[in-house]
Amino acid sequence: MTSASDDLVDLPIPAAELTVELDSGSHWYGGAHLLRQLWPLERANWEVGPLYPFDHGPNGLGSVVGTHWVNSRGLLVAVDPETPMLHAGLNAPLEQRSTFTPRYFGVGVQHKKSVSGMGYYDICVLRVAVSAHSDVRTATLAALSPLQSPHQMPPAVFFQRSIWTTWATSHADITQSDTVALAEAVIQNGFQPGVLEIDDRWQSRYGDLKFDSLKFPHPKQMIEQLHELGFLVTLWVMPFLQESSSACSEAKRLGYLVDGGKPPSILRWWGTQPVRAIDLTNDEAVEWFVRRLQKLQLEIGVDGFKFDAGEPCFLPKGALTRRQLRYPGEYTQLWVHKVASCFPLSEVRSSMWTSGYGGLVRMGDRDTVWGVENGLQSLIPALLTSAVLGYPFTLPDMVGGNAYWGQFPDTELMIRWAQASVLMPVVQWSIPPWKVSIEAKEACFAAQRIREKVLLPRIEKLAASAATSLLPICRPIWWLDPLDPETFCIDDQFAIGVDVVVAPVVQQGARERRVYLPRGQWLEWRDIAGIDHCQPHTGPCWIVVEAPLQKLPIFVLVHSDN
C-alpha cells in the first residue's frame, strides 16, 4: 500500500492501514512483550500505537518487539520492520481485529525535518506478507527462517551457573561492601558462584564509567576478590550520558549526542538526572563509547556488561542524528548490534529484529506479585512469546521480582518463582532466598539442583541448535503437537526441546494442578528418584498432579508415536 503527495508536506492522517479480522476459531501468538502478557495474544487488548521497543509504553508495549504474528491454524502475518512510523494494535476494545498502519504521528521519535513532529514522507510504503502453512509450528519456523541467527551461543557460564544481581536488594544504594557481602553470602549459603552483576549507580555520574569513590573506594581490588570467590563480574550501562559528566562534555564537543527537543538536552527517562543520548547512527560515536567500555575492562578487570535501555521511546521528539533513523527501532538495533555485540558476556533488554545478537535477551522488570499484570504469571507467556519472535536465549527477570514500592516476596511466592525460572535458559537471582525464610532457601536450592539434573544435560545441544536456527530452547506445548487444539491456550506450561514438559505452579495457594501431556508415553520426573516408572501416562491427556510447595511438576517423554 502506498500514499503519495505532490510535495513534501505534513500529513495529519495515516498513509495506509491494514486490518486483519480475527476469527473466533483461532489463537494468535507473537508481536511483542506486553506489560500485561497474555497467551494466546487475542486475550489481550493492544491499543493501536507505535510499534517499537518501549519502557512501559502508552499502549502497553514492552522492550522486546517483533513484527510477525502466527495463529493456531498456521497463518503467518509479517510486517516489514523498516516501515517508517509503523503502528500496530490487536483486539482493541470493541474491535476484534489486528491493525497495522504507518502513521504520521505518535510519541517519542519523530521525523527530524518536521516542525510539527509529524511524519514527512512523499511516499510511505506498508509491506505486509501473509502466508498459510500446515500448522502453527510450521508457520513459526517460516517466520524465523529469514531472521538472522547469532551462530554462536552465549558463554556457557550463563547456563551452567546463575546470575546474581545487586539490584533488588540495594537498588541505587549499592556499595562495594554490599557487593562483596552478597558474593560471600551466596557461597556461605551453599549456592554456586556464577556471574555477579553490579547494577545501577555504581558510577558517580552516568557515562563517565568511573566507580563512585565514596561507595566503591577500591573497585579493582573488589573485582579481584570477586574473581577469587569464583564470580565473573558485569556492570550496568546505558546509552545515556549525564549532562554534568566529563563524558557528556567530550561527546558534545565531538558531536556524538542526539539533539532535538526543547531545549535540546531534554530526554525523558526513569531517572531524575538530566541526561543526553549517544548518537548511535554516528559510527565514530559508537567506536568512542565501545573503546571506553573496553578500556574499563582492561583497567579494572570487569568481564562484561548489562546493557540497559536502548528503546527509541527515550529519544527526544524531532531527534537530530548524524544519519536520519530510517525507522525508530533502528536505534535499538544499533545499540544491540553495534555496542552490546562487542562483548560476549552481555545481556540486553531491548530488542527489535536483533535475533543475530549472541547474548541474553532479558524480560523487563517484574513486580513482586503473583498476577499476569507483570508478576509471576507473566513469566511463561513472555518466555513463549520470545520463542515465537526468535529470541531463544531468554533471561527471565530476577527470582521474586524487583521488590519495588516496599514489596517483598513471602516464602510461597519466592519458591514458586524459583521453580518457574530454573528450567528457563538462564536463571537470575537478586533477592537472597535465605533472607526470605529457611524454607525458601532450601526450596530454591532444591530448584537449582533440579536445573542441574534436568536442563544442563540437554542445554548444550539445544543452545547450539538455537544459535544456528533460532529453534527455541523452551517451547510452547503446541510445538510438540501443533495440530492438537488442547495445546493452543496453555499459558502455564512449557516444553524443553521435545522430551520434557515443565508445569510450574503459578497460582497462589495451589497445592495441585492440572497438567496437559501431548501424544506419547510420559513419566513423571522426581527430584530424588529420577524418572518414576511406576505411573506412565499416555497422552494426549489431562492429569491432576499433587504439587506441594517443594515440588516442581516435570514430565519426561519415553516413547513418542509422533
PLM region spans:
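Catalytic and substrate-binding clefts that recognize carbohydrates or anionic sugar/phosphate headgroups
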Residues: M1-A156, S177-Q188, L480, E546-S560
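Extracellular structured ligand-interaction cores
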Residues: L8, S63-T67, S72-G74, R161, ...
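Aromatic- and carboxylate-enriched substrate-binding clefts and catalytic-loop regions
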Residues: S24, L35-L38, G190-Q448, L480-P482
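Generic recognition of flexible, low-complexity loop/linker segments
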Residues: D55-G57, V64-G66, P150-M153, E184-V186, ...
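Short acidic-glycine loop/turn motifs at beta-strand connectors
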Residues: V70-G74, P81, D259-K262, P518-R519, ...
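N-terminal small/glycine-rich loop or linker at the start of catalytic domains
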Residues: P154-T169, P264-A277
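Catalytic core of carbohydrate-active enzymes
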Residues: A340, P344-S346, W353-G364, V388-P396, ...
